[in-house]
């Protein structure tokens, strides 16, 4: 074969191969078009929302993922999951002991990292996850602006949330709303957060729903409008929230607001025999919401508000048991008071909680009767109704040689199971006023959940050494 014949043969072969490749490409394109236009598709769907794979993994807000491959390019089409309002249909699980749930070691880590100064922490869950919440002071522990963070109210505070058991940092915290008093809860569809800000005599609350401001409430007594400092609870979209405006050492005006999708359905003044209400810790079960609160005026026993979210009504009383759970407090008496404050708190108090479930009742309190140190859980059957009830079992959470602080209840209402697992957190305050060699006041968090087993015990201190900050 001469050179010219070789060239012609090679060219013809290349032309045939090229033609075959073009035909394969046209066939592939036709098949893909046919698949996308096949009659069995559901063409009535609304316009889908496209996201990348990393959003699907992190947020977990979507389902029904369809992936079609065209020429090595992934096109991901997703639909937003439809969620319903959560209903409080279950009762509490039997509580025999408490296991560790979360601990952020924020002050220890903050000795050498950009950890935010916080206080008034809590835990709240949604259908996808549980997160830590707290009121930030707008500075880090090591920052110079941490000087003076012992003060509760300023223009620099904000409700933030961050992943469970991580410390709150500039990088992992999400701002929910701006203010120095807060509550937040998920109704099954989305989250409602409430923040209060402003001067003492003219504060106001902004109610956020689905990350947008929906409603505002102005002060009614012009004396530090304030709310729960832990999560609220929702039933069938109705989310009651307890507010107080007025004196911390005398009569005040408490209201229970009923919200749905961030809008006010109704509000009512405090009813029942409780004389003073602050900083309620709430939980829900069997279509009822129970809130254990703080009587800062007179009571060393804790007031309780029981709310019917269906009828949107409530009543109040005190925990009858002589096992007193506020701080400061006197030694436990022989007989408690159901409808009156038990004296001895010297116009002071601390946020606390309880699970009031007949023989399955547990009360939380500081171990010290004079200062915010130590923490223990006590099983006190029928504490709500029996004025002579006594502890039958206990578990130490924080030793009396270690600092504690506020405490409150929370539950994961979306966890699997036939009952709700009771959970709580304890604020571990460090810095001023007790440790005045440093200029700041902050905290870490430890949280526990109930077990039906009789588990071994351990204590859970904050663990930071103040001398490392000097």
From Swiss-Prot:
Disulfide cross-links: 93-419, 125-130, 177-195, 185-232, 234-239, 280-293, 282-291, 320-338, 423-449
Annotated segments matching region Head of neuraminidase: 92-470
Record: active site: 152, 406
Cellular localization per UniProt: Virion membrane; Host apical cell membrane
EC class of the enzyme, as a word: hydrolase
EC number: 3.2.1.18
Virion surface compartment residues: 36-470
GO MF entries: exo-alpha-sialidase activity; metal ion binding
Membrane topology summary: Single-pass type II membrane protein
One GO term describing the cellular component: membrane
Glycosylation sites noted in the Swiss-Prot or TrEMBL record: 42, 52, 63, 66, 87, 147, 202
Catalysed transformations (reactions): Hydrolysis of alpha-(2->3)-, alpha-(2->6)-, alpha-(2->8)- glycosidic linkages of terminal sialic acid residues in oligosaccharides, glycoproteins, glycolipids, colominic acid and synthetic substrates
Region (Hypervariable stalk region): 36-89
Binding-site residues for Ca(2+), renumbered to this chain: 295, 299, 326, 348
Region (Involved in apical transport and lipid raft association), start-end ranges: 11-33
This protein's UniProt keywords: Calcium, Disulfide bond, Glycoprotein, Glycosidase, Host cell membrane, Host membrane, Hydrolase, Membrane, Metal-binding, Signal-anchor, Transmembrane, Transmembrane helix, Virion
Post-translational modification: N-glycosylated.
Activity regulation (UniProt): Inhibited by the neuraminidase inhibitors zanamivir (Relenza) and oseltamivir (Tamiflu). These drugs interfere with the release of progeny virus from infected cells and are effective against all influenza strains. Resistance to neuraminidase inhibitors is quite rare.
InterPro entries to which the protein is assigned, alphabetical: Glyco_hydro_34 (IPR001860), Sialidase_Influenza_A/B (IPR033654), Sialidase_sf (IPR036278)
Binding sites annotated in the UniProt record for substrate: 119, 153, 278-279, 294, 372
Miscellaneous comment as given in the Swiss-Prot or TrEMBL entry: The influenza A genome consist of 8 RNA segments. Genetic variation of hemagglutinin and/or neuraminidase genes results in the emergence of new influenza strains. The mechanism of variation can be the result of point mutations or the result of genetic reassortment between segments of two different strains.
Domain text: Intact N-terminus is essential for virion morphogenesis. Possesses two apical sorting signals, one in the ectodomain, which is likely to be a glycan, and the other in the transmembrane domain. The transmembrane domain also plays a role in lipid raft association.
Protein name: Neuraminidase
Organism: Influenza A virus (strain A/Tern/Australia/G70C/1975 H11N9)
């Amino acid at each position: 074969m001469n050179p010219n014949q070789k060239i012609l043969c090679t060219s013809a072969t290349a032309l045939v191969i090229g033609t075959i490749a073009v035909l394969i490409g046209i066939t592939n394109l036709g098949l893909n078009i046919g698949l996308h236009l096949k009659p069995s598709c559901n063409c009535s769907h609304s316009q889908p929302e496209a996201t990348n794979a990393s959003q699907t993994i992190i947020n977990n807000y979507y389902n029904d993922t369809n992936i079609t491959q065209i020429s090595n390019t992934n096109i991901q089409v997703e639909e937003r999951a439809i969620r319903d309002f959560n209903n409080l249909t279950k009762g509490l699980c039997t509580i025999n002991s408490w296991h560790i749930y979360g601990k952020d070691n924020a002050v220890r880590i903050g000795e050498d990292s950009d950890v935010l100064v916080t206080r008034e922490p809590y835990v709240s869950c949604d259908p996808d996850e549980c997160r830590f919440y707290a009121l930030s002071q707008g500075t880090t522990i090591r920052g110079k602006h941490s000087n003076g963070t012992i003060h509760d109210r300023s223009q620099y505070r904000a409700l933030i949330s961050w992943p469970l058991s991580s410390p709150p940092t500039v990088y992992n915290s999400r701002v929910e709303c701006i203010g120095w008093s807060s509550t937040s809860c998920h109704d099954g569809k989305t989250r409602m957060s409430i923040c209060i800000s402003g001067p003492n005599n003219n504060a106001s609350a902004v109610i956020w729903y689905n990350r947008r401001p929906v409603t505002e409430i102005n002060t009614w007594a012009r004396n530090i409008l304030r709310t729960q400092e832990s999560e609220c609870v929702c039933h069938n979209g109705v989310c009651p929230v307890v507010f107080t405006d007025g004196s911390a050492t005398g009569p005040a005006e408490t209201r229970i607001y009923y919200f749905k999708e961030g809008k006010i359905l109704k509000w009512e003044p405090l009813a029942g025999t409780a004389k003073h209400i602050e900083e309620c810790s709430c939980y829900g079960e069997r279509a009822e919401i129970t809130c254990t609160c703080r009587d800062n005026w007179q009571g060393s026993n804790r007031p309780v508000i029981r709310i019917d979210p269906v009828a949107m009504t409530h009543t109040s009383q005190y925990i009858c048991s002589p096992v007193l759970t506020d701080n400061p407090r006197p030694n436990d008496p022989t007989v408690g008071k159901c409808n009156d404050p038990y004296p001895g708190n010297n116009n002071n108090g601390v946020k606390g909680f309880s699970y009031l479930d007949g023989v399955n009742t547990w009360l939380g309190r500081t171990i010290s009767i004079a200062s915010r140190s130590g923490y223990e859980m006590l099983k006190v059957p029928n504490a709500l109704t029996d004025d002579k009830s006594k502890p039958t079992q206990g578990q130490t959470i924080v030793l009396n040689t270690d600092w504690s602080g506020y405490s409150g209840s929370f539950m994961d209402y979306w966890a699997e199971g036939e009952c709700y697992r009771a959970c709580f957190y304890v604020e571990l305050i460090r810095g001023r006023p007790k440790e005045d060699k440093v200029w700041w006041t902050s905290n870490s968090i430890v949280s526990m959940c109930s077990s039906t087993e009789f588990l071994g015990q351990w204590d859970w201190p904050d663990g930071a050494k103040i001398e490392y900050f000097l």
